Amino acid sequence: MSTLSYVSPDALKGWLMESPNEISIIDVRDYDYEGERIPGSVRIPSDTFLASVDQHVDDLMKKRSLIVHCTYSQVRGPKAARVLSEILRNRITESKEKLSLSQKEKLFQNLPTVYILHGGFSAWKRRYGGQQGLIEYD
């Protein structure tokens, strides 16, 4: 399994401005979700992540980058990112189609890159809380 990388709030903002349709942001906050989120993010709470993420996998596989975060991205965000990365890889290895090793490798190379938001939503809010359009409210 590949090593997961972190992305800074500044880099994520750039991606959102340049190519918002190529990324998905997955918010795994639970009890600490207070109705504020990064624009366009999908909320899949960590306490139901394993049971819920599969319904999103087909859409997520169409993206270039997936960014996972919780409040601080210290425990839940990284854990969900590892699980998501494994689920995406398993989707290829468990494919019902008979694929050659080279075909599977090509599919692996085209999987979205899974990132963890450095500092989590807390860092995002601290950096962009006062800027129009960078936080959505329920």
Swiss-Prot record:
Q: Which InterPro entries match?
A: Rhodanese-like_dom, Rhodanese-like_dom_sf
Localisation:
Cytoplasm; Nucleus
All residue ranges annotated as the Rhodanese domain in the record: 19-133
GO BP field: cell division
The catalytic residues are 70 (phosphocysteine intermediate)
Q: Which reaction does it catalyse?
A: O-phospho-L-tyrosyl-[protein] + H2O = L-tyrosyl-[protein] + phosphate
EC numbers listed for it are 3.1.3.48
Q: Can you cite an annotated GO cellular component?
A: cytosol
Q: What is this protein called?
A: Dual specificity phosphatase ibp1
Which species is listed as the source?
Answer: Schizosaccharomyces pombe (strain 972 / ATCC 24843) (Fission yeast)
* Gene that encodes the chain: ibp1
